[in-house]
Amino acid sequence: MGTPFKMERGVKYRDAAKTSIIKVTNIDPDRELLQKPSWMKIKLPASSAKIDSIKNGMRRHGLHSVCEEASCPNLHECFNHGTATFMILGAICTRRCPFCDVAHGKPLPPDPEEPRKLAETIQDMKLKYVVITSVDRDDLPDRGAGHFADCVREIRALNPEIKIEILVPDFRGRIELALEKLKNNPPDVFNHNLENIPRLYREIRPGADYEWSLKLLREFKAMFPHIPTKSGLMVGLGENNEEILQVMRDLRTNGVTMLTLGQYLQPSRYHLPVARYVSPEEFDEFREKAAEMGFEHAACGPFVRSSYHADLQASGGLVK
């Protein structure tokens, strides 16, 4: 009998180390992968000076970006434009979703100085719009909601003109407590991603629940009817287009007015494989359907991610 696997606190488990402890049957690192179509090619910038500057600034303040931790394909574009999505509460997630490249493990306690350091970094970068997200922190009584509120408060204290979007986890089992924590320091945009369709949740989002996520979006909107709510979906995990359209209908039924829809890309051979590549024309059709359903803003395209050009989307610009 083998020795039971024991995670060490503060250690990042990624790729094979992460997915080896997930009971997912269709991860085969030796399987033949789908060939990327021509529209999935990324053009890298000629200079990395701006990218290095942002990375060094974050390292200097001990901060993290989801752009790096989740291996976002748009990192070079966004960093070159001087924008980044900050990831609070550390870089180790208590969940182990097999599509995600963020490390899994036992996280360290939250840094009480992080809200202040974050606010100062944003001030140094002279940002007008910022997106704050986090790992899942199922180890915390409020699931990290109080830390979100502290960050919003500190950011606004130093940057009174800024617009703040928060991309939150599902606050599993603590929705009411989480919303109470956010009550006095709400964001300008509240974002929570459904990620994909309910039929695939057990496989792709272990520990999550489709109805919980809808409840979170619905109850935030009931508490703050004037604040836009937003959600994002990935395609290419085994769903079909009609199932995605049904999720979009569910979002509208629960008051969500902003949508992002992008192509899933496999971070490594130890993650869930891409089941299909959706064409740009299909993304255009999704955007048209979203408008018909009443979404005020819908960013739909192969490289669209939840915080991709979030400032442009919030102002009503076309993102694809």
From Swiss-Prot:
GO terms for molecular function: 4 iron, 4 sulfur cluster binding; lipoate synthase activity; metal ion binding. It catalyses: [[Fe-S] cluster scaffold protein carrying a second [4Fe-4S](2+) cluster] + N(6)-octanoyl-L-lysyl-[protein] + 2 oxidized [2Fe-2S]-[ferredoxin] + 2 S-adenosyl-L-methionine + 4 H(+) = [[Fe-S] cluster scaffold protein] + N(6)-[(R)-dihydrolipoyl]-L-lysyl-[protein] + 4 Fe(3+) + 2 hydrogen sulfide + 2 5'-deoxyadenosine + 2 L-methionine + 2 reduced [2Fe-2S]-[ferredoxin]. InterPro entries: Aldolase_TIM (IPR013785), Elp3/MiaA/NifB-like_rSAM (IPR006638), Lipoyl_synth (IPR003698), rSAM (IPR007197). Pathway: Protein modification; protein lipoylation via endogenous pathway; protein N(6)-(lipoyl)lysine from octanoyl-[acyl-carrier-protein]: step 2/2. Its EC number is 2.8.1.8. Its main location: cytoplasm. Signal peptide: none annotated. [4Fe-4S] cluster 1 binds at residues 67, 72, 78, 307. SUPFAM superfamilies: Radical SAM enzymes. Pfam families: Radical_SAM. Its cofactor is [4Fe-4S] cluster. [4Fe-4S] cluster 2 binds at residues 93, 97, 100. Keywords: 4Fe-4S, Cytoplasm, Iron, Iron-sulfur, Metal-binding, S-adenosyl-L-methionine, Transferase. GO terms for cellular component: cytoplasm. Binds 2 [4Fe-4S] clusters per subunit. One cluster is coordinated with 3 cysteines and an exchangeable S-adenosyl-L-methionine. NCBIfam families: lipA, PRK05481.1, PRK12928.1. Belongs to the radical SAM superfamily. Lipoyl synthase family. This is Lipoyl synthase.
